Design a protein with these regions (language model features):
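Sec-dependent bacterial lipoprotein signal peptides
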Residues: 1-28
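Structured C-terminal helix/loop/strand segments within mature extracytoplasmic catalytic/sensor domains
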Residues: 5-6, 29-58, 62-86, 90-92, ...
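Short, conserved catalytic-motif segment at the N-terminal edge
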Residues: 91-117
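Mid-domain, small-residue-enriched loop/turn segments at the edges of structured enzyme/sensor domains
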Residues: 95, 166-221
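Active-site-proximal beta-strand/loop segments in catalytic clefts of secreted hydrolases
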Residues: 101-103, 154-158, 166-170, 183, ...
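Active-site SXXK
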Residues: 106, 117-141, 154, 282
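Conserved catalytic neighborhood of penicillin-recognizing serine enzymes
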Residues: 136-185
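A conserved catalytic-loop motif detector
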Residues: 200-261
Length: 323
């Protein structure tokens, strides 16, 4: 069967020949000449095949860049940014534990310091809020409207006074018995001058515990409680705009930060989420070990988040705080 184009050409040629035959008959007869379109293959000029290009003359087709080595189930782009974070942290003061989790794929990256215990500072307030909200809904305790206002301020401005109010009202054993259920499996309580443990302000844990805590918030809490905490952590006071907040507004971050001065020096922590639908969780704990202060620590944890979620560093936070 002829291709459609060839068949159409043949029909046109036949039509022209038919018309010519009719005209010749009307004139008393004439000879038909072959149309140029009907030239026989023998009379057509022979085609000369083009020489094959040499291997060196052919333009090389660029191959796509190889996906960097890294934790399974992360995108190639995220793997590259994780490598950038590793390189960045080599030149930062102190010890920084980092855990990144992709809730969509289940991918998890833990750096080499992720399992080292660090003072929690005010990140323990998030664990307190989770315990209070969960047990209130279960009917184990009752949170009054006043308690809820105190809880909100404890998260929004990281009020130590409000944390004390809720800690002593419900008792240390209420929290310590519940914390392992929400991810703080390795938490320890340490002594400090004038403080008898256990106390929310003198807790230590590794970044892996903080990662499990924020994962519990997003994956295991009832929808109403999860929604409350996501909204609250997404609208914290400006002095909480560091750490995970470095992901940038386009990534809709939310975080609970913490800072304190302990025996090892300044402690700067941040735990929270970023990405559409809180896709990623990020936990960071920075013990500066006497090699920097508040600004060095907040810059470090902010740049880690910025590199992971923006692909580049950002201006260092300009906020300040006192221990």
């Amino acid at each position: 069967m002829l291709p459609a184009v060839a068949l159409g050409s043949a029909v046109k040629v036949a039509a022209r020949r038919g018309a010519a035959a009719v005209a010749c008959a009307a004139l008393g007869g004439c000879s038909l000449l072959s149309s140029p379109a009907a030239t026989s293959p023998a009379s057509a000029p022979a085609s000369v095949p083009a020489p094959a290009p040499s291997p060196g003359s052919a333009a090389a087709t660029p191959s796509p860049p190889a996906c960097p080595a890294g934790p399974a189930k992360f995108t190639c782009g995220m793997r590259a940014r994780i490598a950038e974070v590793v390189a960045y942290l080599k030149h930062r003061p102190g010890v920084v534990g980092v855990v990144l989790r992709d809730r969509s794929t289940g991918a998890v990256w833990e750096n080499r310091f992720a399992h080292i215990p660090v003072y929690m500072a005010s990140t323990s307030k998030l664990a307190m809020a989770v315990a209070l909200l969960t047990q209130n809904q279960a009917g184990v305790i009752h949170l009054s409207s006043g308690d809820m206002s105190v809880l909100h301020e404890m998260l929004h401005v990281s009020s130590d006074t409000d944390a004390d109010t809720l800690w002593f009202k419900f008792g240390a054993s209420f929290y310590t018995g519940f914390f392992p259920r929400i991810g703080l499996a390795s938490a320890q309580y340490v002594s400090a001058p004038g403080i008898t443990p256990p106390y929310w302000g003198e807790m230590i844990c590794p970044a892996t515990d903080l990662s499990r805590l924020i994962t519990y918030v997003l994956d295991d809490m009832p929808a109403s409680l999860r929604g409350y905490l996501v909204a609250t952590l997404s609208h914290v006071a400006t002095d909480q705009h560091f750490g995970v907040w470095g992901a940038g507004s386009a990534n809709h971050p939310g975080n609970k930060d913490g800072w304190s001065v302990e025996k090892p020096g300044w402690i700067i922590n941040s735990v929270g989420f970023a990405g559409p639908g809180q896709r990623y969780t990020l936990a960071m704990m920075n013990s500066l070990n006497g090699h920097g202060g508040y600004h060095a620590g907040t810059d470090t944890v902010t740049q880690v988040s910025a590199i992971l979620f923006r692909g580049h560093q950002v201006q260092a936070p300009t906020i300040s705080a006192t221990p």
